[in-house]
Swiss-Prot record:
This is RNA-directed RNA polymerase L. PROSITE patterns: RDRP_SSRNA_NEG_NONSEG. It comes from Maize mosaic virus (isolate Maize/United States/Reed/2005). It is found in: Virion; Host cytoplasm. It catalyses: RNA(n) + a ribonucleoside 5'-triphosphate = RNA(n+1) + diphosphate; a 5'-end (5'-triphosphoguanosine)-adenylyl-adenylyl-cytidylyl-adenosine in mRNA + 2 S-adenosyl-L-methionine = a 5'-end (N(7)-methyl 5'-triphosphoguanosine)-(2'-O-methyladenylyl)-adenylyl-cytidylyl-adenosine in mRNA + 2 S-adenosyl-L-homocysteine + H(+); a 5'-end (5'-triphosphoguanosine)-adenylyl-adenylyl-cytidylyl-adenosine in mRNA + S-adenosyl-L-methionine = a 5'-end (5'-triphosphoguanosine)-(2'-O-methyladenylyl)-adenylyl-cytidylyl-adenosine in mRNA + S-adenosyl-L-homocysteine + H(+); a 5'-end triphospho-adenylyl-adenylyl-cytidylyl-adenosine in mRNA + GDP + H(+) = a 5'-end (5'-triphosphoguanosine)-adenylyl-adenylyl-cytidylyl-adenosine in mRNA + diphosphate. Belongs to the rhabdoviridae protein L family. May form homodimer. Interacts with the P protein. Residues 595-781 form the RdRp catalytic domain.
Length: 1922
């Protein structure tokens, strides 16, 4: 577990590391040891020249031996390029026995059962892709594999040859010790004279390979290459094999937007040709490959927007103007210019496929010295601004997080300073306020706010990192040995073992005061590995204490400071990082009145440019925050005073008694204060980010920044632009944006130049489409597919670890999972990983990397298994080969088998139970296997036998484990050996550390774990935490950091130790052969969840609680349909897009990115403070379980407290919450420590935006129900993935609905709370070491950060206020829900949409809204609305989004609807929130668990005595207390006249969910429809007439629905009674749907109802299915979501009887509106339902006809016209749809999103419009942002109003309207055209244009082109609100 990310598992950390700067494939090199290649399978060091290598004594010695034995010379050495091409093109591949490849091939071909691979592949693919049943057969899979094998034969054979040779090379130490070769291959022998392995490669080719040199004899020539060149070439052939094989598979699978094999070969050939011609210099061209490809994508940007879209491409090409390399760049450019961005991105990851250059180490040193020698004189004005900007960012962010400002001192008090007044009164600083003066920050000085934790000591940053000897040590080494190499002085671990105890608090204080001792001021530099730069990029090794200083201070920044700079991504978890990349990249696709572009900044040697005077403005502030002003400023002083030397051995170094190494100016030098790679990344990043935000401030643009090190990507958003109807920027706006971008770019270059951190102008590029961050590419907001880089690095063998079969298969699994993250789906990866697993299994038998060191490869003869509690030796034969291979391809490490990964787990991260995952996968896989014998073998992999020993330590360390009979092997073996070494080591001179290591005693540890698991039932997740919090867990954590190190392994790994490991591995392989010969102890049930519980119960002999979770592939059945019906299932509704476009376009749905499960309550303030201490972290976190998992005072709670008492003398009181403050189920919310808790998709999630999912429809298991063992994230991921791949593979599909229904009735069970009587272990004490500073901390030594002090004081103050307990007061759920809703309205609390729906289901809407409204009004009456304005009203819409809510609140508050739909919810007129007459007498309570306690207290005062609101003195007192967030002495918050000392409101502390969820669901009863309550009144409904020849429309007042709905009720009822209707189509309008439902209920009829659903709402919930739940149960099955491709016949007809008296006989075509059915009942005819409608009313065209069938009635929203109108026959050819008489302007292009105007022709109607404007403006003013943004938003709303006025105005309407809203408009509206376009694609629009041209040439209008306007706000928003 990484201390920076304690909550992430290693797998997630691997992915996160690939995202973060400085972590991408970096490895440290340990001096010259890397050259001997011992145990290495891949290149890990930079490639050196012959001259540099000869400076290493080890290599020089080996070369001298090779000269004698083989006659080699410098001239016969192959370059690294020659070596690579020899491996790629000239590998001797003889198939004859007695040659290496022939021996290998012969042995592989005898193993057999290769056909099983094909069967397993097809079956695994079909587990999630059953639609591929006919395409994926074993024969088809075999055909595809054979094609891929044939096309990649050369690479496959060469890779196999060289990996075999390298593996044999690694046997040399063991074979030399043994004196013989253990391999019985005729082609391999040990040459005892030279010590080399002799390999017969071909008829005339012999290869001799040693630890450092490989000699190739092909008569008559002798060539040789250093081993590093060989490793480089072997890596490249393996990488090319992987990518070519994968591309070939993708070709056959027809993966869209792929790089085909032919394309790939062309790309690789260009690079190869370049290297052949240019040699090592060709890597300069190869190094430009990435920039070229990014430049090609950038060239596709909008030329009218981006000032120089060719910049990156052009500068890349110009760099090689006079170089032969240019032609190769041109070839690539031509090649890629015709490819899609997805294809380019995929090829982008191939930049290392051509190998690596020979580095110029001296050139790298000179370049480093050249940059470092530049004197920096940054402009003082820039430094001053940076200092101010740092304070602004830190103070505002600190206040946002903690609600108070950091400790500071005002140096010079200024009158009327906005900043100083805000700091004084603790008010939020708005940097856009008019009175904000940036220079006032000079008057503010930060004080100490953060402490260095006392328990930070030697072990806090203990890692296996190479270090430099100090000056004295290196002086002695050079003087005595003539070399700088000495392992004891170069490993940090050994230093830690031998050093005295160091408390970092004192250590850092000493550095702050006096600096570092001179003896420690030394830095070694070495060339970074696997780079493409010829001039070496140098990394640094520091002395132990210098490293301790740098690492500790960086850790302080990471732990304490970075959270206040959210722009920095270095400390973000994986999911947050991914979401932020999506957010920043997607801004480029916005089509509103703004435009966003992406800047990629490229600094020139960012680290080396840093100096003390550059960093001082930030570093001095950082130091002051820790009370040590010089702490960070010492960085560059220390660098300046340090001796810097080349530590990799190539330099000529001489000893110096002062410096350690004589500073000759070439290989060693001093006086260099420049920054060094990787030593102060976080500090320098903060400086860079502060400077960028300073520049952004000057240009008034919004900035989204992602920064880590020198990799800075920022999106700048320019507002105030105008777009045409196609969404493109008009010319003027494009010019404005170009100017802004150009000015911003120039300012970036100038400011950073003035600071001394120059940007590379030629590569600081801008794009409006391409976003790149750490190799992740997004194009127009969509992540690009790019799996090839990860594919290329899928290797079974890895450096620096023991190569067991389990490790090799895990390496494959990790690589495949990393590749899947960049891939669309896992189908081609199933091929890759299954074939790779088979190869590993073959290699383990033929040439095992470990066991062949000591024994000849043979099949095992006997294997040991356990049955019925007894060990049994089982004879094995070749007959078990098939079983062995199968276990290696489908096994699970949880079952004791090699850890393969299967498709259902490949596509997600975070599923908590690997046992049920494996068992359910096997149960799904077996039926799909074609071969019955193979199916039987696979089924047996799910069987288990029980170990005869019960080691509870294994269960506690891994709570999901089972006690199987597999033997220990591999890393488990070496882990214990290393612990034994540490316990007995004499190296540990530190007595405290040595004392800790005594806890590693096996027997003592076993006794502890046995006692911990002594209860009747095992609550194993809790036991895991208890053990982790104990000293056993703490010590094991330290040991795990040590025993994974190369250093300690080297101390252990003598040949004897390695032989023990090899023996363990041989036993394990024999076990795999023997495992399934005899019947197992336990076999699976039909349900995997039941099986897993049984396995755990019987293997551990006790019931294991809380870890078994059913997997969705067995628990749920996924089905699909093209018609939507209500189902008790998780539902996924797709849009109408299918085929490859779903991968390259963004839908309107919300992308599902998964989620981490968060705990629903926080630790106490004191627990949060103490949790900073290393020793206490786990024990303090454990205390949260009291009253959550176990009640306070219970026996188990006492053990939980005991864990804390064992390591501190602090009282355990105050470390846990009271029971009423806790919410959230433990089993769901608390993950196993170190693992992901939640679930994240592990594939490109773009296609999920084309679907809308909900779990609310799963009524049996939805929110508010029972606590069950369901992992909802995995259910959603499984459902979305299946739907996504199905739709992506089949173009032309209609919209579909996918259901994930419960399939297995046994999977889902209730989670039962544990009983302490059965789960409490018999544990009386925990290990404790009070006198050991590593293991115990006294409370007096715990110093709290300032914000913790404030929070604890505040918490104590609030605790003193408590006077009530939940259950002991009259508090109702309505009161509490009203408080929550109020806090949401003012933006103080965020609540999920699903919880709001739960509130809606449990609490009556009217009293709930009243409870919130009371508080809103009292805030206004107290004058606190300036501090707490209404910020967000979306919660109102969601709470009232039911027929009950609409009806109740319309009657109660006069609430008006702007609209309402099932998918998007309702949209209310929220102006009622500003009506003070709604206030009702009440007495408000206070909940200390919620936010804004001072405000709650103030409202309680006002509610108990309304006179307080009228008293100016009371209001002034209250405002002062609330603004300062005071809570003490709250009873005296009134003036003397109104003071009441007995004032005592209900004050409690309780989690709101406990109150709200305790309520039962509201009984819905009859269906409610607004305005349709009294049936009798309906017959008298007024019908409105209209003259369509005039544009004077009827007045639709606020009672619009009161007129319409009754008429629709009558119409609908009459139709159902009179006509044989088959179905009803209803617009997605909440009131109309409920009306139809009510009619059906009243008539007791069922009929198919089709709801015309719109586009996805993009919310986290799926509203329509929540609304289906509200319908009467017998109607649910009749409701269908109507999609655009699933309509009833548009020409559906209705049978009508003839009647000569019909008023419609005089015409053939009639325009019908909703109330005319009664008049047309006797007319022959049919109703034409338009295929595309422009009306918002129920309308159709009646065609009088004597041919008729059954009709479908269509009912739509917002009916405006109610009489029939005969249609002139001459228009009928253009009139296939009714005309729209709706004059509401389409204002979306004008920025009026969310506003719908009512129609009006009088001042009375205008008042409705104004009320809506007021509501919109109040929402804007409630969340204003900066002043400019607020002004722009107001102008948008008012602009839309003005346009509406202009179009509707008659006579003096414009003047009246202007006066009413106090807005003047100057200028004119120009280029205004009619709404209907004669050239439009839509026939409807063309028909309307003809009609309007004839009937109404002057209206209606919409702005189509540029809009010239000047809108002046003559009053503030509060005036507009009346």
């Amino acid at each position: 577990m990484d201390p920076d990310y304690p909550d992430l598992d290693p797998e997630s950390l691997d992915v996160l590391n690939s995202l973060q700067e400085g972590y991408d494939e970096e490895e440290e090199e340990d001096s010259g040891v890397s050259l001997n290649g011992m145990g290495d399978y891949h290149l890990k060091s930079a490639l050196r020249s012959y001259t540099d290598m000869m400076k290493h004594p080890i290599f020089k010695k080996e070369f001298s031996k090779a000269v004698i034995n083989f006659g080699i010379s410098h001239d016969s050495m192959m370059s690294q390029i020659e070596t690579m091409f020899y491996i790629l093109k000239s590998t001797p591949l003889s198939m004859h026995l007695g040659t290496l490849y022939g021996d290998l091939f012969t042995r592989q071909s005898t193993l057999g059962h290769s056909e099983d691979v094909f069967d397993i592949i097809q079956a695994e693919i079909r587990t999630l892709h059953p639609h591929l049943l006919l395409e994926m057969t074993p024969a088809k899979v075999e055909e595809m594999v054979l094609i891929a094998d044939r096309k990649t034969y050369d690479e496959r054979a060469a890779s196999a040859f060289w990996s075999t040779l390298i593996t044999i090379k690694n046997y040399i130490p063991a074979w030399t010790e043994k004196g013989a070769c253990t391999l019985d291959w005729p082609s391999v022998s040990l040459d005892k004279k030279s010590g080399y392995v002799k390999v017969m490669a071909g008829k005339d080719t012999t290869i001799y390979i040693g630890t450092d040199i490989c000699v190739i004899e092909k008569y008559p020539t002798v060539k040789w290459a250093p081993l590093s060149y060989l490793l480089n070439g072997a890596d490249k052939v393996a990488e090319r094999l992987n990518v070519r094989y994968y591309s070939c598979l993708c070709d056959q699978l027809d993966i869209p937007d792929r790089i085909t094999l032919d394309m790939l070969d062309e790309i690789i050939k260009v690079g190869d040709d370049c290297l052949r011609e240019m040699g090592n210099d060709g890597y300069n061209v190869i190094g430009s490959y990435e920039a070229l490809l990014a430049g090609i994508i950038q060239r596709r940007d909008n030329q009218g927007l981006i000032p120089d879209r060719d910049l990156l491409w052009r500068t890349t090409m110009e760099e090689f103007t006079s170089s032969p390399g240019r032609k190769y760049l041109e070839e690539w450019s031509t090649m890629f210019s015709s490819l899609s961005p997805e294809q380019i991105a995929c090829a982008h990851g191939l930049y290392r496929i051509w190998g690596h250059p020979i580095v110029d180490i001296l050139g790298g040193i000179k370049k480093m010295q050249e940059v470092a020698s530049v004197k920096k004189n940054p402009r003082q004005s820039v430094l001053d601004e940076i200092r101010r900007q740092f304070k602004e960012m830190f103070f505002t962010s600190y206040h946002r997080i903690h609600k108070h400002y950091p400790l500071h001192t005002i140096l010079n008090s200024l009158d009327n300073s906005y900043i100083l007044n805000c700091l004084k009164d603790n008010l939020t600083i708005n940097t856009s306020a008019i009175s904000y003066n940036f220079q006032d920050w000079d008057c503010v000085m930060v004080e100490k706010n953060f402490e260095v934790p006392f328990s930070w000591n030697l072990v806090h940053n203990l890692k296996d990192k190479a270090i430099s000897p100090n000056r004295q040590e290196i002086y002695q080494t050079i003087s005595t040995r003539g070399t700088i190499f000495g392992s004891q002085n170069r490993r940090g671990i050994l230093k830690s073992l031998t050093m005295e105890t160091v408390q970092l608090r004192d250590f850092l204080q000493g550095i702050n005061d006096n600096g570092l001792d001179d003896i420690d001021k030394i830095i070694g530099v070495y060339p970074k590995e696997r780079e493409l730069k010829i001039k070496a990029r140098l990394f640094s090794l520091m002395s132990f204490r210098l490293r301790l200083y740098c690492v500790s201070t960086e850790a302080l920044l990471g732990d304490k400071i970075l959270k206040y700079f959210p722009q920095i991504t270095m400390s973000l978890d994986m999911l947050t990082m991914i979401k932020k990349m999506f957010k920043v990249s997607s801004q480029t696709t916005r089509e509103d009145d703004s435009v966003t572009v992406i800047f990629n900044l490229d600094f020139i040697k960012w680290n080396l440019q840093m100096r003390r005077n550059i960093c001082e403005p930030v570093f001095s502030q950082l130091g002051k925050l820790f009370g040590m002003e010089n702490l960070f400023n010492r960085t560059h002083e220390t660098f300046r005073d340090s001796l810097i030397y080349l530590c990799s051995g190539e330099g000529v170094l001489s000893a110096d008694p002062v410096y350690g190494v004589f500073p000759d100016g070439t290989w060693a030098w001093a006086g260099d204060e420049s920054g060094k790679e990787g030593l102060r990344q976080k500090g320098w990043t903060i400086l860079t980010v502060v400077t960028i935000m300073l520049i952004a401030k000057r240009h008034n643009v919004d900035v989204s920044l992602m920064g880590g090190g020198d990799n800075q990507v920022l999106g700048i958003t320019i507002s105030g632009v105008t777009r045409d109807l196609q969404g493109e920027l008009i010319t003027e706006s494009a010019s404005l944006a170009r100017r802004t971008i150009k000015q911003f770019t120039e300012d970036l270059l100038t400011t950073f130049s003035d600071l001394g951190l120059p940007l590379k102008a030629s590569e600081t590029w801008v794009s409006d489409s391409l976003f790149m961050y750490n190799k992740h590419m997004f194009y127009k907001g969509i992540p690009l597919r790019s799996p090839l880089k990860a594919i290329s690095r899928i290797f079974p063998l890895a450096n620096d670890t023991i190569m067991t079969i389990d490790n090799m298969i895990n390496n494959i699994s990790s690589g495949v999972k990393a590749a899947c993250m960049k891939e669309r789906h896992g189908i081609p990866l199933v091929f890759m990983k299954t074939l790779a697993y088979r190869k590993v299994a073959e290699g383990a038998l033929i040439l095992h990397p470990l066991t062949t060191c000591f024994r000849t490869p043979t099949l095992p003869e006997n294997g040991t298994v356990t049955r019925d509690g007894r060990k049994r030796s089982v004879k094995v034969t070749r007959n078990q080969l098939r079983s062995f291979f199968t276990l290696c391809m489908v096994g699970s490490s949880t079952m004791g088998l090699p850890g393969t990964i299967h498709l259902p787990d490949m596509i997600m991260r975070g599923f908590p139970d690997p046992l049920t995952s494996h068992l359910s996968f096997i149960s799904e896989l077996v039926p799909k296997i074609m071969d019955p014998r193979l199916a039987s073998i696979i089924a047996t992999s799910g069987h288990m036998s029980i170990n005869r020993m019960t080691e509870y330590a294994k269960l506690v360390e891994d709570p999901v484990s089972i006690n199987h009979d597999a033997p220990t092997h591999g890393l488990n073996e070496i882990r214990q050996l290393s612990r034994d070494f540490l316990m007995n080591t004499t190296l540990a001179a530190n007595t405290h550390l040595k004392s800790l290591f005594t806890l590693l005693d096996r027997q003592r540890e076993k006794e502890f774990y046995d006692a911990l698991c002594s209860a009747e039932e095992l609550d194993v997740k809790v036991l895991h935490e208890v053990a982790g919090a104990s000293l056993f867990g703490y010590t094991n954590g330290i040991a795990s950091r040590i025993d994974q190190t190369r250093t300690v392994r080297a101390l252990n790994e003598t040949v004897n130790v390695m032989k023990r490991l090899a023996d363990a591995e041989a036993r394990y392989i024999a076990y795999l052969f023997a495992r399934d010969i005899h019947k197992h102890d336990l076999i699976p049930d039909q349900c995997s969840r039941v099986t897993a519980d049984r396995y755990r119960y019987y293997s551990w002999k006790k019931k294991v609680l809380g870890v078994t979770v059913p997997h969705p592939i067995e628990m749920c059945q996924v089905t699909s349909a093209t018609q939507t019906a209500f189902e008790d299932a998780v539902i996924c509704w797709s849009d109408n897009l299918s085929g490859s476009r779903i991968y390259t376009t963004m839908g309107l749905g919300k992308i599902y990115q998964g989620s981490y499960t968060k705990e629903r309550f926080k630790a106490t303030d004191i627990a949060a403070a103490y949790g900073n201490e290393d020793i206490l972290t786990k024990a303090v976190r454990l205390q949260k379980l009291i009253n959550w998992r176990y009640d306070e005072g219970s026996s188990f709670a006492r053990i939980i407290q005991l864990a804390l008492r064992a390591i501190t003398d602090a009282s355990t009181d105050g470390f846990h919450r009271x029971k009423e403050e806790i919410k959230g189920e433990f089993d769901h919310r608390r993950g196993i420590s170190g693992d992901i808790s939640g679930g994240i998709p592990n594939f490109l999630v773009t296609p999920t935006s084309h679907x809308s999912c909900t779990t609310s429809s799963w009524i049996s298991h939805s929110r508010g129900g029972k606590n069950e063992n369901i992992h909802f994230q995995s259910v959603l991921i499984n459902l979305l993935y299946r739907a996504m791949v199905y739709r992506g593979s089949l173009p032309g599909l209609p919209e579909m609905v996918w259901y994930s229904k419960e399939r297995c009735s046994h999977c889902i069970i209730d989670i039962v709370e544990p009983s302490p009587e059965r789960t409490t272990p018999a544990l009386s004490e925990m290990p404790s070491a009070p006198n050991n500073p590593f293991a115990f901390i006294e409370s007096v030594n715990v110093k709290l950060d300032y914000h913790h002090q404030v929070e604890i004081e505040k918490g104590m103050e609030e605790t003193n206020l408590l006077n009530s307990e939940w259950g002991g007061s009259s508090l109702t759920s309505v009161d509490e829900a009203g408080l929550v809703l109020f806090l949401m309205l003012i933006g103080s609390r965020q609540v999920s949409e699903s919880f709001l729906l739960l509130m809606r289901e449990k609490i009556e809407p009217r009293p709930l809204l009243q409870a919130a409204l009371n508080r809103v009004i009292l805030v206004r009456k107290l004058g606190l609305d300036r501090l707490f304005p209404i910020r967000n009203t979306k919660c109102i819409n969601l709470i009232l989004g039911s027929d009950r809510g609409i009806t109740a609140c319309h009657d109660g508050f006069g609430l008006e609807l702007h609209g309402g739909s099932w998918e998007k919810g309702i949209e209310c007129d929220t102006s009622f929130l500003y009506n003070d007459t709604h206030l009702k007498p009440c007495k408000l309570h206070v909940n200390l668990h919620l936010q804004n306690v001072p405000l709650q207290l103030a409202l309680a005062h006002a509610s108990y005595n309304p006179d307080v609101c009228e008293c100016l003195e009371c209001r002034a007192i209250i405002e002062d207390r609330v603004s300062k967030r005071m809570v003490g002495q709250y009873k005296s918050w009134r003036c003397q006249y109104h003071a009441v000392l007995s004032f005592s409101p209900i004050i409690m502390r309780v989690h709101s969910e406990r109150i709200i969820k305790s309520e039962g669901a509201i009984y819905e009863g009859d269906l409610h429809v607004p305005y349709v309550e009294e049936i009798i009144a309906l017959e008298n409904s007024q019908k409105l007439a209209i003259d369509v020849t005039s544009w004077r429309l009827p007045l639709l007042m606020h009672a619009t629905w009161e007129s319409i709905l009754p008429q629709l009720y009558i119409t609908m009822k009459a139709c159902l009674v009179s006509l044989p209707l088959e179905g009803v189509i209803v617009d997605d309008d909440l009131a109309l749907i409920n009306l139809v439902s009510k009619v059906l209920v009243d008539l007791r009829r069922t009929i198919q109802v089709y709801i015309r659903a719109g586009t996805f709402s993009g919310s986290e919930i799926n509203n329509k299915y929540d609304n289906i739940r509200l319908l009467p149960e017998d109607l649910r099955d009749s409701i269908h979501i109507l999609t655009t491709t699933d309509k009833p016949d548009p020409a559906a007809t209705v049978q009508l009887a003839a009647d000569d008296t019909s008023p419609l006989d005089c015409a053939v075509y009639h325009l019908i509106w909703g109330d005319t059915w009664g008049m047309t009942r006797k007319v022959h005819g049919r109703i034409l339902i338009p295929s595309s409608r422009v009306t918002t009313g129920f309308a159709g065209v009646m065609v009088t006809d004597y041919y008729a069938t059954v009709a479908v009635l269509e009912l739509a929203g917002a009916v405006n016209l109610w009489e029939k109108k005969l249609i002139d026959l001459e228009h009928r050819n253009n009139l296939d749809v009714p005309l729209s008489m709706n004059r509401v302007l389409a204002g979306s292009r004008l920025g009026t999103r969310g506003i719908r105007w009512a129609q009006w022709t009088s001042p009375a109607g205008l008042e409705i419009v104004v009320r809506k404007v007021r509501a919109k403006l109040s929402s804007i003013s409630g969340n204003p942002g900066n002043a400019a943004k607020w002004r722009r938003n107001c102008q948008k709303v008012l602009k839309a109003l003005m346009i509406s006025l202009y179009a509707h105005s008659g006579e003096d309407m414009m003047r009246n309207a202007s006066g009413l809203v106090k807005v003047n408009i100057h200028g004119t509206l120009s280029s205004v055209t009619a709404v209907c376009d004669p050239s439009a694609e839509s026939r409807v629009q063309r028909a309307q244009f003809l009609f309007l041209k004839e009937k109404a040439p002057n209206g209606p209008f919409i702005x189509r082109s540029r809009l010239e306007r000047r809108i002046n706000l003559l009053s503030v928003v509060s005036d507009l609100l009346g």
